[in-house]
Amino acid sequence: MGYFDYSREPQSDIAFVDMKSFYASVECVKRGLHPLKASLCVMSRADNSTGLILASSPLFKKIFGKSNVGRAYDLPFDIKTRKFSYYNARKQGLPTDSDYVRYIEDWAQATLIVPPRMDEYIAVNMEIQRIFQNYGSPDDIYPYSIDEGFIDLTSSLNYFIPDKSLSRKDKLDILSARIQRDIWRQTGIYSTVGMSNANPLLAKLALDNEAKHTPTMRANWSYQDVEEKVWSIPKMTDFWGIGRRMEKRLHALGIFSIKELATSNPDQLKKALGQAGLRLWFHANGIDESNVHKPYKAKTKGLGNSQILPRDYVKLRDIEIILREMAEQVAIRLRRSGKKTTLVSIYVGFSKQEVRPSIHTQMKVEPTNNTAILTDYVLKLFHNKYTSGAIRSVGVNYSGFVDESFGLISLFDDVDKLEKEERLQTAIDAIREQFGFTSLLKANALEEASRSLARSKLIGGHSAGGLDGLK
């Protein structure tokens, strides 16, 4: 079969468990609603038309045709009045006849739009992690995100299901069903499981491409399924590791399907796409070198923060306050990681009313993790590109890392001043580490334009908690 003798490849019994519409399901359960039968949407900043849809129940998606990650203005109704939006409907090519309008307005009235509660989602996630640990040791569990994770059940199958008449495939299915049952009984949340008696990659592909559409919400893809199932994935972007940009690059090479990728020349792929091309070739053939205990980790490309502002920022001083705060927040993360940056980048997105492209710019710098120096670089980049206009989103990113011990001091540097700043910076970081980011704030944090205090109450940019740099 193909290039590989799969009998020589590593074999593990993997379950990849995904919580169905996790945030929305948690909100439904907390309100005594059935997660699959209620129309509910978790929306950040629902008080304005740019509210971000973070999650939605399956019924919400079915009725309004919206998946996760969208905007309030993408919905066919006004979130405040719950009336049909003819403007949005026409823009999206939706019908506007009276029956459809009535259908949307009736469901809009019955739909719950709720703010995110990240602390609640984390608490439920911890409960689910404890369920996982009933079936495998902590070393056998790899959380992939807050709502999904891998469990290596290789050493657990025979312990929980000693029946020798059953195949490992059957045992994996039985044990995965028990995990689903326990999650539902203890949290009220439904889960989907991708399984594989081969490796984590095939378990992930089974989840994304089959398990979500089966009555049991489980599916198993192993080595014997590569040609029939993996090669038959209809959209290349449904394959792990292929986004729109990579898809275009593959198309340029004359590759338009997973089968064509799997049967292409690996040397040519490596020449055109580097190691990423070679890795995709292996994956298209069902080969995955990672495992749950030592998962593949991509090289860190950078550290950054970005945010959508609650209103349009027009005044230059207000925009500078935001950029200063973000430069400092990312600098804190940089020092925590024991690194210095050699490349500073910023992103500035304009308001919808501004007909102009976003600003993307960067500059190479001498290795540093000094807040004051990095802030100066960020502001310099901004002033070099910005002339005028209302701003609605900003981002700051540091990359090109070197070890913290690396440093270059020129004859023109004030060494005493640099050492003094470093000691002060270390002291500030230590205080914030122990007492929280807001224990020490600059005076401009009290200004109306500042976002430091507001974002200190967030987790992952949403309600409850804080950013890494805003502990």
Regions found by a protein language model. Name each.
Residues R117, I161-K169, I308-L316, Q362-N369, ...:
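Short histidine-centered catalytic/ligand-binding loop motif
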Residues Y3, S7-E9, F16, K61-K62, ...:
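DNA-contacting surface of Y-family translesion DNA polymerases
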Residues L379-Q434:
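C-terminal hydrophobic structural anchor segments
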Residues E120, N370, D403:
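Glycine-/small-residue-rich active-site loops that bind phosphorylated ligands and cofactors
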Residues M1-R279, L418-K471:
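Gly/Gly-Pro- and Ser/Thr-rich, intrinsically disordered tail segments characteristic of DNA damage-repair
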Residues I146-G149, K340-E354, N397-F406:
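Core structural elements
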Residues L157-P162, V355, V402-I409:
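Short, charged/polar, Gly/Pro-enriched secondary-structure boundary elements
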